[in-house]
């Protein structure tokens, strides 16, 4: 095995995938990168057993095919301290990887590529294409509502499903729910999967690139996404996701229309004196007035009032102020619309003139 590559290209691709490297005393190969070269393509692979990243680079110089694994951190630290435009030569000799560049030479230990756990075979039941900026936005609109180390393991991820010719992303921790829709241009096979939260966060990071068309393959227990020259694969969470549609409001009457900026500033002021543990605030709404009240364990209080558009009956509710702020931070319109359900147990929030995103927050008992 032998190849030559420009250093800045190698470093750029190493940076994309080395976040997955983990220290594992019982499985040390997880600290390594799988390096494989064949058919003019250099593949760099990392995995944490749940997520796998493969970066592919076209090699334009002479090479000898082969595969091996070396320390990911060490090769990245070596190369990032070499001249950007210099050529890095990497031949494999007697189970040692030699790295040479200008006047610098290194010899690295290796582990067999045959012991590296990777998803070589991938059988899919559905596949489709979607713009990276659309998927990125769908993730951003919902990921904050995912469960965090919940015993209901299926909540610790994001639901992604095809339904009624729409792609839907849904996240809930049992106290709040976020949903985002995107219309699919072509009909595809039905699927409904739960992507683990760590994989969702990693995918969101990878989508911080120029807008491009993604190729997404859905497997029975994993999902694979082609992001230009990068391949993202993750295992899925098994289990049945809650019936989120039963939570969405069937009837939306007496809308409460509030300016996003005014509401956010009012909530931030009230949050200063909210209870540190429960984070609850009181909201009173009546005839174009929105009043926010908070108090805490030290018997301190805050009250804030601003104008809204509402002519219905008086409403008094309690809500987690930070759940509400999370929603507002993800709404870009000038105004937002709030609806209260009949049982007064939850509110549904939407952006004005945008029905592709919706948020449900359970109310606190007063």
Curated annotation (Swiss-Prot):
Coiled coil: none annotated. InterPro entries: DNA_clamp_sf, DNA_polIII_beta, DNA_polIII_beta_C, DNA_polIII_beta_cen, DNA_polIII_beta_N. It is found in: Cytoplasm. Pfam families: DNA_pol3_beta, DNA_pol3_beta_2, DNA_pol3_beta_3. One of its GO terms (molecular function) is DNA binding. GO terms for cellular component: cytoplasm; DNA polymerase III complex. GO terms for biological process: DNA strand elongation involved in DNA replication. Its main location: cytoplasm. It comes from the Bacteria. Forms a ring-shaped head-to-tail homodimer around DNA which binds and tethers DNA polymerases and other proteins to the DNA. The DNA replisome complex has a single clamp-loading complex (3 tau and 1 each of delta, delta', psi and chi subunits) which binds 3 Pol III cores (1 core on the leading strand and 2 on the lagging strand) each with a beta sliding clamp dimer. Additional proteins in the replisome are other copies of gamma, psi and chi, Ssb, DNA helicase and RNA primase. Belongs to the beta sliding clamp family. Confers DNA tethering and processivity to DNA polymerases and other proteins. Acts as a clamp, forming a ring around DNA (a reaction catalyzed by the clamp-loading complex) which diffuses in an ATP-independent manner freely and bidirectionally along dsDNA. Initially characterized for its ability to contact the catalytic subunit of DNA polymerase III (Pol III), a complex, multichain enzyme responsible for most of the replicative synthesis in bacteria; Pol III exhibits 3'-5' exonuclease proofreading activity. This is Beta sliding clamp.
């Amino acid at each position: 095995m032998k190849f030559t590559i420009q250093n800045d290209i190698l470093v750029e691709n190493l940076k994309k995938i080395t976040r997955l490297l983990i220290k594992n005393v019982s499985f040390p190969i997880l600290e390594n990168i799988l390096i494989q070269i064949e058919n003019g393509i250099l593949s760099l692979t990392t995995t944490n057993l749940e997520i796998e990243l493969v970066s592919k680079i076209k090699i334009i110089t002479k090479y000898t095919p082969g595969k091996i694994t070396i320390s990911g951190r060490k090769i990245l630290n070596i190369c990032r301290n070499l001249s950007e435009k210099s050529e890095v030569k990497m031949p494999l000799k007697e189970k040692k990887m030699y790295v040479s560049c200008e006047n610098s030479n290194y010899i690295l230990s290796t582990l067999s590529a045959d012991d590296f756990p990777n998803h070589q075979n991938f059988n899919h039941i559905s596949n489709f294409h979607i713009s990276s900026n659309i998927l990125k936005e769908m993730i951003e609109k919902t990921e904050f509502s995912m469960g965090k180390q919940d015993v209901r393991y299926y909540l610790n991820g994001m639901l992604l499903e095809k339904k009624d010719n729409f792609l839907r992303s849904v996240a809930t921790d049992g106290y709040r729910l976020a949903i985002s829709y995107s219309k699919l241009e072509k009909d595809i096979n039905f699927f409904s999967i739960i992507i683990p939260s760590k994989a969702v966060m990693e995918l969101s990071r990878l989508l911080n690139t120029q807008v491009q068309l993604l190729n997404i393959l859905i497997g029975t227990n994993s999902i694979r996404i082609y992001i230009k020259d990068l391949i993202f694969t993750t295992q899925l969470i098994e289990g049945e996701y809650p019936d989120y549609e039963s939570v969405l409001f069937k009837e939306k009457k007496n809308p409460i229309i509030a300016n996003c900026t005014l509401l956010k500033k009012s909530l931030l002021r009230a949050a200063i004196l909210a209870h540190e543990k429960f984070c609850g605030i009181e909201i009173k709404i009546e005839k174009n007035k929105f009043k926010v009240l908070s108090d805490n364990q030290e018997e301190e209080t805050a009250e804030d009032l601003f104008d809204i558009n509402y002519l219905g009956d008086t409403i008094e509710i309690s809500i987690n102020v930070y759940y509400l702020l999370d929603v507002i931070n993800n709404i870009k319109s000038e105004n937002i619309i709030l609806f209260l359900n009949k049982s007064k147990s939850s509110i549904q929030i939407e952006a004005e003139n945008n029905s592709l995103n919706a948020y449900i927050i359970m109310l606190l008992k007063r």
